[in-house]
Amino acid sequence: MELTRENYNETAKELLTFLQNSPSCFHAVKNVVDMLTAAGFTEVKEEESWKLEAGGRYFVTRNQSSVIAFKVPGKDFKGFQIIASHSDSPTFKIKENPEMEAAHCIKLNVEKYGGMICAPWFDRPLSIAGRLVVSEGSRLVSKLVNVDRDLVMIPNLAIHMNRQVNDGYAYNAQKDMLPVFGSLEAKGTFMSLIAEAAGVKEEDILGHDLFLYNRQPGTIWGADETFLSCGRLDDLQCAFSSVKAVIEGENSSSISVAAIFDNEEVGSGTKQGADSTFLKDVLERINDSLGRTREQYLMAVASSFMISADNAHAVHPNHADVADPTNRPAINEGIVIKYNANQKYTTDAVSAAVFKALCKKVQVPVQTFTNRSDIAGGSTLGNISNAHVSLNTVDIGLPQFAMHSPYETAGVKDTCYFIKAATEFFNSCIVAEGNGNYSLGE
């Protein structure tokens, strides 16, 4: 299918709606589950026995913040074809007993989650979303909550009192970045407000995972309307695209898998993160439920392939010098393959070649990224999950500006590019032949 401006704009608007409805990782996974359910996927639970059938579509969640969706072509599958992304983004987590009185105001005690850009969080309407655990008789029930209005703000100190603010000021998370909740009249009302938003009684709330989020809606902008900006593009742009692709793709030889992990922004070392057994557990249970042997599982893993999808840095128009001199991704110019000699990214010659061949087949443009040799970069899902399920992996992402800002910018075209390439990935039968050789069939 040839992509058109109409395709780009329609998909961009759909993505922005998804982002708008996903103010926390819990809401993002809930929206993914809704997409999967509407497409005929059936939930299986880790606490229950799995009875998978040929032709079945399934998903499983962990902690309400990670989800793995998969399709079963039949018992005699050759391998797993996996796209991994993540549901979380840098933000602030509300601490226990958060209310603090200061200067005729009530502010909230929060702590930073992930490696954020601090400055853009100031002077803009924010709100709170996340998860509550509520007592219902003898049961404890998790409920999502979103205070869907402008609720708090982190005000800047006037330049007259902070002359260094434009000269590399170092923000103190405990002092500078606590959001104002209300006047003194709001004292003691935080939990009752949260309870009201969730439709529960305050006294029934026994636990909470609550986060700040930017209230500014996403938008498509630019003279030619080719940019889109919103919160949480990293990495919900890739997560959204992978779910669209696993729904659309059809494969008669391999298990198609879309895995969305939590806690990538804080190292992935949780039960629901990429550095957990979640993916390994799911793949093994698929194999076992279909009556296959342990050796057949290991053979399938050896013939599997994973795309680790986490957004990439585009060359910044005001800071072009910080990009590598020969690998310079641009927004709206295609999917970015990420390389790192020290294996912060898993891409090697073999995995890059497989991905390039898939993209070439459907005429999706590809770019390359590596850090300048004198600038350290980050890492992502691929090398972490490979410690538990070792398989050939390529690290890719969609190019963007302002990564880890509460309002990031990406391209209108690039979401379509990834959906198209990811769908082709799930349509293809990628088989390892050994010694770095692969066949890419239908």
Task: Spell out what each predicted region is.
Residues 1-442:
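N-terminal hydrophobic/helix-forming segments and targeting peptides
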